[in-house]
Structure formats: C-alpha cells, structure tokens
C-alpha cells in the first residue's frame, strides 16, 4: 500500500513527459524513478554541475545534454508516443520534436538500465556538486 501511495504522489507531481520518461526508467531498471533518480549524483534531477559521480550519473548528464540540444521542443513538457515491444522501447512519432524528445528519454533509460550496477546509495541526495558544469 505504501508503494502505491508513493507512485500516486509521484504521478500527481510530474509534469509533461516526465511521467513517460519515468515509465521508461522503471521498465529498464526496476527502480521507482523519482525515489531512485530524483536527486542522484550531480546530474540526476534538476540542474547539475561538477563531474558525474559514476556511470549512472553520467547517463543523466548525457540526458541533460540531449535535452539542451532539443531545447526548442520544450522537452520537459512535450508528450510523445512510445511503446514497449519485445524488451525494446520504440518511439512512435512522426513529429520531429516528439521523436527527438522521445529518443533522448529512450537512450537515457537504456543507459540507466545498462549501468544499474553502478548505482550507489551514497550518491542519493548528494549535495557536493560545486565544481563547474560539465560541457556536453
């Protein structure tokens, strides 16, 4: 019941495609996205600076960079179509912005899944990110 409540609160709190991105992350990692990645390392969550703390954090930096590249598409608000098929995430969008945002999220979710073994609880709610922002 507690997990259901947490998921319900998370669904209410997200905006735009963040729910869609969260579903992709959950599918690839088995982790609740907002709890596991909402403030992980220096780049998972809002903002970011300093060197990534591990491969998981690097996935988030790459995702931030991807969102920067598609910034004119309002990536945090753009809703897109996708599906899970035979273990893959398929982006189903003819619109270039929707496809680009979906691909950013898809690649980040795959990266997080491939690096789930680098996830280290000591970087959850990590606050020592004081160095300069990493270049994309």
UniProtKB/Swiss-Prot annotation:
GO cellular component, one term: extracellular region
MF GO annotations: calcium ion binding; calcium-dependent phospholipase A2 activity; phospholipid binding; toxin activity
Leading EC class: hydrolase
Cross-referenced InterPro entries: PLipase_A2, PLipase_A2_Asp_AS, PLipase_A2_dom, PLipase_A2_dom_sf, PLipase_A2_His_AS
Catalytic activity field: a 1,2-diacyl-sn-glycero-3-phosphocholine + H2O = a 1-acyl-sn-glycero-3-phosphocholine + a fatty acid + H(+)
Tissues showing expression: Expressed by the venom gland.
Cystines in this chain: 42-129, 44-60, 59-111, 65-136, 66-104, 73-97, 91-102
Cofactor note: Binds 1 Ca(2+) ion.
Record note on pH: Optimum pH is 7.5.
Activity's thermal dependence: Optimum temperature is 37 degrees Celsius.
Residues of the signal peptide: 1-16
Residues involved in Ca(2+) binding: 43, 45, 47, 64
EC number: 3.1.1.4
Catalytic machinery residues: 63, 105
Major place of residence: secreted
SUBUNIT field: Monomer.
Family to which the UniProt record says this protein belongs: Belongs to the phospholipase A2 family. Group II subfamily. D49 sub-subfamily.
Additional record remark: Is non-lethal to mice and devoid of neurotoxicity, myotoxicity, hemorrhage, anticoagulant activity and cytotoxicity.
Job of this protein: Snake venom phospholipase A2 (PLA2) that inhibits human platelet aggregation induced by ADP, collagen and epinephrin (possibly by binding the platelet receptor alpha-IIb/beta-III) and induces mild edema in the foot pads of mice. PLA2 catalyzes the calcium-dependent hydrolysis of the 2-acyl groups in 3-sn-phosphoglycerides.
Protein name: Acidic phospholipase A2 EC-I
Organism encoding this protein: Echis carinatus
Taxonomic classification: Eukaryota, Metazoa, Chordata, Craniata, Vertebrata
